């Protein structure tokens, strides 16, 4: 056997990995073909089916259920497909059950149950080499490097030198939510609709009154006895709580009003006993919330829910009733994973970013809790945490940081399995609309089977279109074995949901310090795609969340740990607080550095 020679200054401390694992592992995880239907994880193809089923009519009298999928056998071999210009694929089948109910008073009774094995589509199979044979040609699906779901915080310096901050919540599916400062105001924008004061969201999640909102951000207050003090000395201060006339029950001064001469006269004339004001320090630190509340025309939770309802429907009319407005708000963000889904990555990043130790302690006082990593929708605590973070950024408080969108902690890989799952989801969504319509129009005496309801062509068209014409599905580079291997490890920032050449600026194309050990800083095409097409380094790998990890050796007391335990794979986010030395630093065979000073970052 030929011995491999190494001319590097330091010996390899790690065996070369399986270089096309990025393709093979992703597709295997998507198919889960070797697992029994009841043992499959809620991921890939299984997750697509679970998300779309059951399908039913409006009354719930006809229900189409999913009970697992299986694959057929390829009709032709890889060689036959190449020679005859065919696609190397297998049929995807699903076990579907149509349950027909009949109304029995207020209850519903099962009338009949029809089970069928239904052909969903023809699914191209990956070869042992990590490629696909489509119409006789060998193709590769390039992995996509895209902006990760979750929350991000940005800063814009205005021409007058003022800093405006923006937070953006990006879900996998659902409405985008933005909170941004404009001067001394904090605004909420949902799905690029009309902006509204951010305190509208606080009222919607249960902090209904102005005093409730002030209590969230202003801890230091001062109670003034009006009878014993000259109230005029406090002109210009902000009122913390409503002052109520004890005799009539009328509100003399509202919370968040700024005390002036006119209000002082009203208090003295009514014989008010005391007034609670914000301390001077609190006023200076939280002017953002004070100004936002002043602009907020909503005075109750009902007003706030109606404001969101009318804004999203782009009308001046309120919801027909409170129940409709509340149900709409909950389905928009809180309770319906079909309409709003952060995804595992989005939830992980949101929890890691905004739930500081101090904020978690505050949540306990409010009887709220940090959502678990299984929670895919937004929660009341999430909205409060993001608004609190925005206030911290505005005030310049310590512990609050901005995000770098080019940092690899904010960008993740969508490999072939995830890309194909997204396409199948689109196809099944189209099919779902047709099936629900058929079920709604179905007569009681009409005996339809699941096979008759399902139109295979609608899903097949989406899959064929993806492999045949998607920007990420490319003819494999077969100049030589090395170029073939390189093509399978290539990453693209282009494609659906990614960047376009025209709007990709210099920063996103440039080499970033987090690329070290993860992306090759040299291998990128010249021309309009420069910096947008890149390649994985040899030892980098992609973790379960889609972030790129690279191996490091731990160093203790100036000695490199050469053991298996000393090897750590770290993502860009995990290495942030670590000191990283260059891999080319000279050392002896035992792992001791042979120089006194080491370059590190």
Where do the language-model regions lie?
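Active-site proximal loops enriched in glycine and acidic residues that flank catalytic Cys/His/Asp
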Residues: 523, 534-537
